[in-house]
Amino acid sequence: MEKVLLPHTDLEVSRVIAGCMKLGGGWTGGVVVGETHAAQASAFIAGALDAGVNYFDHADVYAWGNAEEAFGRGLALTPGLRPRIVIQTKCGIRWKDEPAGAPHRYDFSRGHIVASAEGSLRRLKTDYLDVLLLHRPDPLWEGEEIAAAFAELKAAGKVRRFGVSNMNAGQMAYLQHFLDEPLVANQLQMSLLHHGFVEAGISFNQGSEGYPQGWEGALEYCRLNGVALQAWSPLDKGLLVGAPLGSMSPAQRAAAELLRGMAAEKGVPPEAIALAWLLRHPAGIMPVLGTTDPGRFAACAAATSVRFSREEWYSLLEAARGRPMP
């Protein structure tokens, strides 16, 4: 597995990130985390490390907090393992009726950011978070308040680095203005089917057809400022790599057929081709792979060894677009 330095840090991390959302029983309500969940998480961590993956992505809301709880219990089963891994989590989403009568919302207040980070530390059974991301933009955010929350957590040794998720170029620039240190990551939906990060450049000045709103300058901001681009849902829930072709749109079917053909030709699993398409982009994209199957990491680790020509990369893009390049 290829390793890279996370920008603005001394953290050597795997190019592929292990997404932990499905741990702790998933989104089924009323689950109490127990020994079975801890054992599953322990096997998940071991399988990821065996494949060379040492970077783990969480959020305080995943599985209603149970994903972090299960991971923490699993981590505790192997004493001394914490220094070998990099833990990242996210905060800022608040569910409906939290507290009773409150709406579903986002919250970047100082109090909530600090409380969320401390809750994650308790559930993960660790003294520090390597990276904390703001999950989704809060329309009521105040840059000064966020900066104060970050400074408090950093001074206490509870969080080492900070980043964002689902933010555009203007939002990143606004937040960075108030911070004393650079943001290290922005996690966005990027994949062969969700290729707005590419389409924004291709379709600029070409009329409105297919133009992705919101991507203007986001990719370039991250590249210019050393913000790691992390891709959530890089496999589109496995649509291109395992779904029946008959269930797909014409563009999806064309992309899936081409992708699966390339996988057979290169002797790698289809997942590796889908991830390698992202890895080929010069922005240094880091896919976040969501799975509870430790064996799947080995299959996807092959992505870092796949070499795409420019022609192969564009062939997949054109198939996924469902129309010729402008």
Regions from the PLM with identified roles:
Residues 34-48, 108-124, 170-173:
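Short, acidic/polar
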Residues 55-62, 133-134, 160-163:
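Short catalytic-loop micro-motif centered on adjacent basic/acidic residues
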Residues 83-96, 187-192:
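A short, structured active-site edge motif that brings together acidic residues
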Residues 1-86, 155:
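N-terminal binding-site loop/beta-alpha segment at the start of enzyme catalytic domains
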Residues 11-16, 52-54, 81-85, 126-130, ...:
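Short, well-ordered coil/turn segments that N-cap beta-strands
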Residues 121-140:
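Active-site groove signature of glycoside hydrolases
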Residues 22-35, 97-107, 199-200:
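Acidic/histidine-rich helix-loop elements
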Residues 137-326:
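Beta/alpha (TIM)-barrel catalytic core signal, keyed to glycine-rich beta->alpha loops juxtaposed to Asp/Glu
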